[in-house]
Amino acid sequence: MPIFKKTLIVLSFICLISILIYLNMYLFGTSTVGIYGVILITYLVIKLGLSFLYEPFKGNPHDYKVAAVIPSYNEDAESLLETLKSVLAQTYPLSEIYIVDDGSSNTDAIQLIEEYVNREVDICRNVIVHRSLVNKGKRHAQAWAFERSDADVFLTVDSDTYIYPNALEELLKSFNDETVYAATGHLNARNRQTNLLTRLTDIRYDNAFGVERAAQSLTGNILVCSGPLSIYRREVIIPNLERYKNQTFLGLPVSIGDDRCLTNYAIDLGRTVYQSTARCDTDVPFQLKSYLKQQNRWNKSFFRESIISVKKILSNPIVALWTIFEVVMFMMLIVAIGNLLFNQAIQLDLIKLFAFLSIIFIVALCRNVHYMVKHPASFLLSPLYGILHLFVLQPLKLYSLCTIKNTEWGTRKKVTIFK
């Protein structure tokens, strides 16, 4: 990134944080909201500060036998074909490309793939297509490929994702460090222009990777290697394959949360990192109902795998601390909102209510300050995501926690992304 853009981001962040500190301390002082504000500002400064120091891995990747694994379930046919083409176009050679259909009721996509592979024999010699007779879930679809490959490195790609031609090559640069066992790339919404929801989702993704994972990568402990574009050493996958397929939580089988589960296996062995130069675009829900179902699944996975991460406090305290911070921030926000609604609202202190909303707006701008130089107009929509986060996603997160034993969340139904 050019130096003037970095300078603009840093100066903007300092200005926003200064306003945030003033609003928080002057209006809320030592109240519950004020205490939450102090912790939030501290956490923001730590994350943004670390992300400013982040640098991607450089050098030339070593020679590896790499297998790409693409599980699919009721996927849009053209979307899956575009995914395969993007994997075939990688600048780093792949030994095997597995496309595993997980018992889809709509077979249009896998039929199109089979026709393409049979027609384009020269470029698809290393493509292995498999149809499962029954739907067992993404983990079992991936496992079918893992069990049959002798690859040194596994590349995981979601079936609705376009990965840039140099994505694998860039990811593998991180493996020049032998202590790194998993790496993830940078994710954006392919259908960002569809509507307001997809634009807000793209803003959130850019923050989740460009800030959160960049900060965590600096400590060598990103919490989630994202499914659309990640690599794992063989030592992460194969010894844990049975655990992966048969994971249970509170006595019930687990079928979702595969990304975080594999990341936890990698954390047990060494470092997990983010490579900003490895990029991909993925389809995101454009309907609120589908979006909330997705968030519910992710929330339950977050809480389940957070318990596992916190248990690592002795063996890997940094991972535990990152996780504890995320959980504590969620809990404190719920308490702060409750205090504001049942205390300040009763007193009809409209100034403080307005100040609280202003803080939410400014926090949203602070979180997404990197986005300012990428899409300036869309950056101004960040406060809308702040409102969505506060009034929709936080209550949903609480609901997810309260219903974490409900197994219905484990069923992922594919939705059409484009009309």
From Swiss-Prot:
One of its GO terms (cellular component) is plasma membrane. Signal peptide: none annotated. The chain crosses the membrane at residues 8-28, 33-53, 318-338, 345-365, 376-396. Its cofactor is Mg(2+). Pathway: Glycan biosynthesis; hyaluronan biosynthesis. Its main location: membrane. Keywords: Capsule biogenesis/degradation, Cell membrane, Glycosyltransferase, Membrane, Transferase, Transmembrane, Transmembrane helix, Virulence. It is found in: Cell membrane. It catalyses: [hyaluronan](n) + UDP-N-acetyl-alpha-D-glucosamine = N-acetyl-beta-D-glucosaminyl-(1->4)-[hyaluronan](n) + UDP + H(+); N-acetyl-beta-D-glucosaminyl-(1->4)-[hyaluronan](n) + UDP-alpha-D-glucuronate = [hyaluronan](n+1) + UDP + H(+). SUPFAM superfamilies: Nucleotide-diphospho-sugar transferases. The keyword Transmembrane helix applies. Its EC number is 2.4.1.212. One of its GO terms (molecular function) is hyaluronan synthase activity. It is a multi-pass membrane protein. The keyword Transferase applies. It is an enzyme of class 2 (transferase). Belongs to the NodC/HAS family. Glycosaminoglycan synthesis. The hyaluronic acid capsule is involved in the pathogenicity of group A Streptococci; it may be the major virulence determinant. This is Hyaluronan synthase. It comes from Streptococcus pyogenes serotype M3 (strain ATCC BAA-595 / MGAS315). The gene is hasA.
